[in-house]
Amino acid sequence: MNTIQPDDWAMHDTGAAPTAEVEGAVAAPVPIEGIRGKLTNQAPLAKLVWFKSGGAADWLFEPADLDDLKTFLARLDGDLPVMALGLGSNLIIRDGGVPGVVIKLGKAFASVETHDDYTVTCGAGAHGVLVASTARDAGIAGLEFMRGIPGTIGGFVRMNAGAYGRETRDVLIDCDVVLPGGSFVTLPVADLQYTYRHSALPDGAVVVSARLQGEPGDPEIIGAEMERVAEAREQSQPVRTKTGGSTFKNPPGKKAWELVDAAGCRGLTMGGAQVSEKHTNFLINVDGATSADIEGLGEEVKRRVYAHSGVELEWEIQRVGRP
């Protein structure tokens, strides 16, 4: 693994990539002069995702701030794939690693601010728990459900994350996005064309912040609802395991976990992966599972559910990278 800091290289920005040589003739994906973030070649990703499995990113970029991110994407070869990585839930990183560039947003993108009109402005790197708690302290209701979703606002916006009867589209006003090429745009919620666990955000777009609409509320009542959400999650889900969250989308009028259970998959194993005994719509890494174990188990569950009920389950967990 090689970490490049901009001061390590004397080079000129010609607008073409690559121009820098890194150890072993590995070329940096952009001219790095003036880039202030951290750029790492062959960066292990397993430690950054909840399943604790998977390969490395060809490149991992951790921008110093918004301007740094815009500069980086403006210089990046448009043919290279770009993926934003949040908290690492809802994600399988395949064992062969991720091509192109993975972008990890840090503290500069994790702020949360409340406003007198009961709106909340939050960075894409802010955790759902922080957003809900900050809103509670300001007497802003309507965001309690985010307490029960593992992830960051950037991921919530991209996939229309939801829980306990509420979804991101119910509270999102708009979001700020850096597009491939480095342009900065604000997209109103209508432009995202939300459906169940899906948005129309273009590939390679990086959400950097979002504005959410709440409503007046009593902090004590809001706090009690957040505690209820947290307790419900603790009681029903394997939250203290290496898991990725809900594995399959709920088919219309049905619950995925019931279909999985009816097909006899509770406790089913493949390699070091297992269908949770506690909640059958969760896969868990119980014994050094590879990502191939986890994804393979999910595919086997899909096969058995279809054979039993005729319903074809759809993955909710994102699966990225090379096998």
UniProtKB/Swiss-Prot annotation:
InterPro entries: FAD-bd_PCMH, FAD-bd_PCMH-like_sf, FAD-bd_PCMH_sub1, FAD-bd_PCMH_sub2, MurB, MurB_C, MurB_C_sf, Oxid_FAD_bind_N
Pfam families assigned: FAD_binding_4, MurB_C
Cofactor(s) needed: FAD
Pathway: Cell wall biogenesis; peptidoglycan biosynthesis
Catalytic residues of the enzyme: 197, 246, 316
Residue ranges constituting the FAD-binding PCMH-type domain according to the UniProt record: 52-217
Comp. bias regions, Polar residues: 235-249
Catalytic activity: UDP-N-acetyl-alpha-D-muramate + NADP(+) = UDP-N-acetyl-3-O-(1-carboxyvinyl)-alpha-D-glucosamine + NADPH + H(+)
E.C. designation(s): 1.3.1.98
GO annotation (BP), single: cell wall organization
GO molecular function terms attached to this record: FAD binding; UDP-N-acetylmuramate dehydrogenase activity
Stretches for region Disordered: 234-253
Entry function: Cell wall formation.
Family: Belongs to the MurB family.
Protein name: UDP-N-acetylenolpyruvoylglucosamine reductase
Organism, as annotated: Erythrobacter litoralis (strain HTCC2594)
Lineage, highest ranks first: Bacteria, Pseudomonadati, Pseudomonadota, Alphaproteobacteria, Sphingomonadales
